[in-house]
Amino acid sequence: MVNFVSLCDIKYGFVPKNSTDLFVKRKIHKLPSRGDVITRLPVFGSNARENLNAKPRRNLRVRPIFCKSYGDAAKVYQEEEIPRAKLIWRAIKLPMYSVALVPLTVGASAAYLETGLFLARRYVTLLLSSILIITWLNLSNDVYDFDTGADKNKMESVVNLVGSRTGTLAAAITSLALGVSGLVWTSLNASNIRAILLLASAILCGYVYQCPPFRLSYQGLGEPLCFAAFGPFATTAFYLLLGSSSEMRHLPLSGRVLSSSVLVGFTTSLILFCSHFHQVDGDLAVGKYSPLVRLGTEKGAFVVRWTIRLLYSMLLVLGLTRILPLPCTLMCFLTLPVGNLVSSYVEKHHKDNGKIFMAKYYCVRLHALLGAALSLGLVIAR
């Protein structure tokens, strides 16, 4: 009795198309004599050729063929093959630090429009402090998402990369302390209490957004908090700090400043919204009810399209009413192709987690370019 077991592994492509693809070859333990003829027999064929010279009758027992699919394993394998350098780049989130640069630069440009002053040293101090605050937001977000399980399979999570929750949290708290120290020191030098209160409000928004016991991002309030923190609070505070001098301690809060801060908050919130497209299933599993979890990706793509339209409609209205200087409006409309790119990309790929991951980076590009255009327009209007 001869036993045959065939294991087919789809991963390596060894899959028999039909029964005649499987053959049995008789094992030979001695040199064949002149009369022996060895043939290959199909396992299942009813018309199997027989050894004409062999008198004994051989019985074949065929066992089932087990075929395994490695579709899921292939995905895991692909994830494991992502270079560590690329994972570190994702963890650093360097493009995301534009959310520190844009409010500061727009605020500085608005202050220059009002006063004709640019305080370079104060600008650099505020920039470094803002970067430290964003670092705290990123690190603490990874820590608390690790605690809830939201980042369990997120390979670019800082906690997963370094393997230490405690170390990551310590780095986050250190960044927060240094960043707040820089902001307070600058505010005290400028003798501007309003700026201190606005910056404190912005940081408070960041805390209740992700830190326990609040974690308001899990209730779908992340986007409004992001809008307030980086728009009216941070942008206006930077305007006040960078326009304060020995001659002018208190700047007026004009419509140009407030409208500019609204635009900054608008595009910052869009980044946060689009960053959740590829995380819908994971967020839902841990009870994180972001707007995209509630809406679904198809309705989310619809929201992105109309958000882009609303953004440029606001620009048009602000330009026609002369709330924003004409150079600002013209410069900002040059970014319209990037806005269309964000809208079309999300609409096309919102169901593809592999591609929609890039949507937030297109939003970062729009945010940075619109901020640069807005800043340049304010400077030109001077």
From Swiss-Prot:
Which region is the signal sequence?
none
Q: Which GO terms describe its biological process?
A: photosynthetic electron transport in photosystem II; phylloquinone biosynthetic process; plastoquinone biosynthetic process
- How does the UniProt record describe the way this protein sits in the membrane? Multi-pass membrane protein
Could you name the domain of life of the organism this protein comes from? Eukaryota
EC class, as a word, reads: transferase
Q: List where the protein spans the membrane.
A: 99-119, 123-143, 168-188, 196-216, 224-244, 257-277, 323-343, 361-381
Has keyword Ion transport? no
| Family matches, as Pfam families | UbiA
EC number in record: 2.5.1.130
Reactions it catalyzes: 2-carboxy-1,4-naphthoquinone + phytyl diphosphate + H(+) = demethylphylloquinone + CO2 + diphosphate
Is this entry keyworded Cell inner membrane?
no
Gene Ontology MF term list: 1,4-dihydroxy-2-naphthoate polyprenyltransferase activity
* CDD domains reported for this sequence: PT_UbiA_UBIAD1
Q: Where in the cell is it found?
A: Plastid, Chloroplast membrane
Report the GO terms under cellular component.
Answer: chloroplast; chloroplast membrane
Deletion phenotype, per the entry, is: Slower growth and dwarfism. Albino phenotype in aging leaves. Decreased number of chloroplasts, but normal lamellar structure retained. Absence of phylloquinone and 97% decrease in the content of plastoquinone.
Per the record, the similarity remark reads: Belongs to the MenA family. Type 2 subfamily.
Please describe what this protein does.
Involved in the synthesis of phylloquinone (vitamin K1). Catalyzes the transfer of a prenyl chain to 2-carboxy-1,4-naphthoquinone.
Which PANTHER family does the entry mention?
1,4-DIHYDROXY-2-NAPHTHOATE OCTAPRENYLTRANSFERASE, UBIA PRENYLTRANSFERASE DOMAIN-CONTAINING PROTEIN 1
What is the name of the protein in this document? 2-carboxy-1,4-naphthoquinone phytyltransferase, chloroplastic
